[in-house]
């Protein structure tokens, strides 16, 4: 028997643990292994540099530096040429640069070589090892503590199991429960390896003494035990009554030694046996009826369970279809809202002009996306906001707020504002103070220094935007006029006049060519614009006619549009009614097909159940027939057993009686023969003894010796013939064996040649060596 003690310890203060860490513990059941233990942990050991590289690869795969950056324009796109996100390689390395990524086994090998060299060379001095962090209060603080092992300090059984601590949500403890409460009670439970049913004993039975030649009726009920017949019921009472009747009937039977009433005894026993068998058959029928009722109940229960399971499957399928339908409707509605929003966005900017972002207006408008970004663009400002929720008694309850307000001083709720005193920079006489003047001069000097510094920086500052570098142009030369004679002036004036004529002619030619080229355009303008009054009147009349025709056309188009609208309305109504009728017909056909399918399934299930029921009925009938046959065979075996038992008893009795009589007769005859032999021995003479000896020698000894001599002579005569026959037989068998071995070797060589040819045909470069056949000679076989 083992005992298990459960000790419930007080729950430790869980407020010091961060909320996020507790959530991780609850979710994962413990902290996961660190990714870069092979670099930081000094206890992390790998066998070789290859394993170190493998650990580095695993850490790189686990801590992938590839990040997905969403594209706000196509965040919800499923198209291949408009991806939702792009991959970005993060430049931030999680491992600092001062941490080496090399295998630490090289340092260990170096230290091992130094140690071996120091062991071999006594003059070699080992370099002193310096601890990387010898500070006691640092990360190595745990190395300076040791807990002694006192095995007998506290007697605690090895199978003590501490009950797990149930985590509770973070609540602010009141002032009265700041310290851990010492429990006044501890629950200690014990558990055994045995059940109550295993240790339950029968009721107490006192000792008893049975008188001689008496059989108490109570002892005949020894087979009834507690739970198996006790406490007694109607069936047990009937069994007891039948046992009493049988004992009374046995008392009325004639005795066995009465040969006169043997036939009567046999008839009474046969009648009782038939009665018992009839009673037994009735019990078997009742038992079978009871089993049949139980089987019917089980079948009914199984059918109910199957129907319930089918209904559950149908309900689950219906719920799944409803959820899929709701999800599809929600998706359609979401897409509808998105499309409407896109259309409204396109309607605001019909021309499709690109507008530059106005940062000032965005930050001045508190309803812009700067202060409230849209979640559909991938910005979730309230993400993980539940981690920063402060659950405080003073903030979440009205009583806490009242208590907090009462505990605050007056200057918090009623602020006291003191106006600042003006700084006096003048004296009573109205002059500026020396300190104020010095401050003013220092401010001027500081401003001059800052301006000078900024000017120097502006000279060396690189230009952000391209600026035009003005290039100084040389000054044009001043025109000068030289005085000429009158004749030269006349000639120059004539030349200038000739040039004017030429230029005018050229311009005239150009105008003519342009008029010829644009003649069609000029004619087109003349059709709509007139310069003369008559032409203007004609054009005005044509314009009025055209406007009248346009008005008539517009009226005709309006009538046609009204007619088309009415026709479209009628067509829409007709189509709506038709589609409604078709959809209802489709639903009706689907329901009809579904009902037909259910009916077919029900019919199929009914047929399968009928087949199973008929099969079970046949199996039951076959089992009943087998039980009847078994019962008949058992009766036959019982009868044959009784018959064989009686036959064996009679035969053994006859054999024993005959053997006793034969033994008595043999003893009597042997006694008579012994008497005769003793009498003859007493009356025999010496000559009669010699005659008896001679008769024994001549009748038994000499014939036996002669018979052995004849047998040996015949054996010697047949020996040479047997040897010759052996030689002939063995020579023939050896030749036959040699021929058989030779044939087998030839068949093996033929098979090897065929395999070699097949291999040569498949792979020409492979050569197969043939085994040489050896034909054994007759001499070798004989040897």
From Swiss-Prot:
Keyword vocabulary terms for this entry: Cell projection, Cytoplasm, Cytoskeleton, Differentiation, Mitochondrion, Spermatogenesis
Region (Disordered): 748-783
Record GO biological process: axonemal central apparatus assembly; cell differentiation; cilium movement; spermatogenesis
Compositional bias annotation for Acidic residues: 748-760
Record's signal peptide: none
Subcellular location, record wording: Cytoplasm; Mitochondrion; Cytoplasm, Cytoskeleton, Cilium axoneme
Residue stretches of biased makeup (Polar residues): 764-776
Tissue/organ expression: Expressed in the testis, in cells involved in spermatogenesis.
Gene Ontology CC annotation, any one: axoneme
PTM comment text: Phosphorylated by PKA.
Disulfide bridge partners, by residue number: none
Known function: Involved in sperm flagellum axonemal organization and function. May regulate cilium motility through its role in the assembly of the axonemal radial spokes.
Family indicated by similarity: Belongs to the CFAP91 family.
Complexes and interactors: Part of a complex containing MYCBP, AKAP1 and PRKAR2B. Interacts with MYCBP and AKAP1. Interacts with CFAP61.
PANTHER family: CILIA- AND FLAGELLA-ASSOCIATED PROTEIN 91 (PTHR22455:SF10)
Record protein name field: Cilia- and flagella-associated protein 91
Organism name: Mus musculus (Mouse)
Gene: Cfap91
């Amino acid at each position: 028997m083992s005992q298990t003690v459960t000790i419930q310890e007080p729950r430790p203060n869980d407020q010091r643990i961060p909320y996020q860490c507790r959530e991780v513990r609850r979710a994962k059941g413990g902290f996961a292994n660190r990714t870069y233990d092979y670099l930081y942990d000094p206890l992390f050991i790998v066998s070789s540099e290859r394993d170190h590289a493998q650990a580095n690869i695993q850490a790189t795969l686990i801590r992938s530096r590839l990040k997905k950056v969403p594209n706000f324009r196509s965040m919800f796109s499923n198209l291949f040429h408009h991806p939702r996100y792009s991959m970005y390689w993060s430049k931030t390395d999680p491992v600092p640069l001062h941490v080496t990524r090399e295998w630490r086994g090289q340092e260990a090998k170096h230290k091992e070589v130094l140690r071996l060299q120091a062991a071999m060379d006594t003059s070699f001095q080992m370099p002193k090892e310096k601890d990387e962090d010898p500070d006691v209060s640092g990360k190595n603080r745990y190395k300076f503590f040791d807990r002694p092992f006192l095995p007998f300090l506290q007697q605690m059984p090895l199978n003590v199991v501490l009950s797990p601590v149930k985590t509770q949500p973070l609540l602010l403890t009141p002032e009265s429960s700041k310290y851990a409460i010492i429990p006044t009670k501890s629950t200690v439970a014990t558990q055994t390896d045995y059940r109550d049913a295993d240790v339950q004993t029968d009721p107490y039975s006192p000792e008893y003494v049975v008188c001689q030649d008496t059989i108490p009726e109570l002892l005949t009920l020894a087979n009834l035990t507690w739970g198996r017949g006790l406490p007694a019921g109607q069936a047990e009472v009937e069994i007891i009554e039948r046992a009493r009747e049988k004992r009374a009937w046995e008392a009325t039977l004639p005795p066995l030694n009465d040969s006169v009433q043997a036939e009567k005894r046999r008839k009474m026993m046969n009648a009782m046996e038939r009665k018992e068998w009839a009673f037994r058959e009735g019990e078997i029928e009742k038992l079978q009826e009871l089993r049949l009722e139980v089987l019917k109940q089980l079948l009914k229960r199984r059918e109910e369970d199957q129907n319930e399971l089918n209904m559950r499957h149908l309900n689950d399928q219906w719920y799944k279809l409803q959820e899929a339908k709701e999800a599809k409707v929600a998706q359609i509605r979401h897409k509808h809202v998105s499309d409407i929003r896109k259309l409204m966005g396109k309607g605001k900017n019909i021309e499709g002009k690109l507008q530059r972002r106005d940062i000032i207006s965005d930050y001045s408008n508190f309803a812009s996306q700067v202060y409230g970004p849209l979640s559909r663009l991938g910005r979730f400002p309230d993400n993980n906001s539940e981690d920063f929720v402060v659950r405080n008694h003073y903030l979440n309850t009205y009583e806490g707020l009242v208590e907090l307000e009462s505990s605050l001083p007056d200057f918090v709720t009623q602020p006291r504002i003191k106006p600042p005193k003006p700084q006096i920079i003048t004296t009573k006489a109205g002059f500026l103070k020396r300190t104020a003047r010095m401050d003013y001069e220092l401010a001027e000097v500081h401003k001059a220094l800052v301006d000078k510094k900024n000017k120097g920086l502006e000279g060396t500052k690189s230009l952000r935007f391209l600026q035009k570098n003005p290039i100084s142009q040389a000054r044009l030369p001043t025109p000068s006029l030289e005085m000429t004679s009158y004749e030269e002036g006349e000639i120059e004036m004539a030349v200038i006049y000739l040039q004017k004529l030429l230029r005018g002619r050229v311009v005239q030619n150009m105008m003519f060519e342009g008029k010829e080229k644009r003649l069609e355009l000029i004619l087109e303008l003349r059709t709509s614009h007139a310069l003369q009054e008559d032409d203007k009147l004609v054009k005005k009349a044509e314009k009025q006619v055209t406007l009248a025709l346009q008005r008539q056309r517009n009226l005709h188009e309006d009538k046609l549009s009204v007619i088309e609208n009415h026709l479209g309305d009628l067509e829409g109504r007709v189509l709506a009614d038709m589609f409604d009728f078709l959809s209802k017909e489709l639903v009706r056909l689907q329901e009809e097909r579904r009902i037909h399918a259910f009916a077919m399934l029900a019919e199929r299930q009914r047929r399968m159940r009928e087949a199973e029921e008929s099969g079970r009925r046949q199996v039951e009938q076959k089992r009943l027939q087998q039980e009847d046959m078994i019962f008949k065979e058992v009766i036959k075996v019982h009868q044959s057993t009784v018959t064989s038992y009686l036959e064996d008893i009679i035969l053994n009795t006859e054999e024993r009686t005959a053997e006793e009589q034969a033994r008595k007769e043999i003893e009597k005859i042997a006694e008579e023969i012994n008497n005769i032999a003793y009498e003859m021995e007493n009356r025999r003479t010496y000559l009669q003894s010699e005659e008896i000896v001679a008769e024994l020698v001549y009748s038994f000894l000499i014939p036996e010796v002669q018979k052995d001599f004849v047998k040996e002579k015949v054996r010697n005569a047949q020996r040479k013939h047997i040897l010759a026959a052996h030689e002939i037989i063995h020579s023939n068998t050896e030749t036959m064996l040699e021929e058989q071995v030779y044939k087998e070797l030839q068949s093996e060589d033929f098979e090897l040649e065929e395999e070699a040819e097949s291999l040569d045909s498949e792979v020409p470069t492979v050569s197969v060596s043939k085994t040489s056949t050896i034909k054994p000679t007759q001499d070798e076989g004989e040897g």
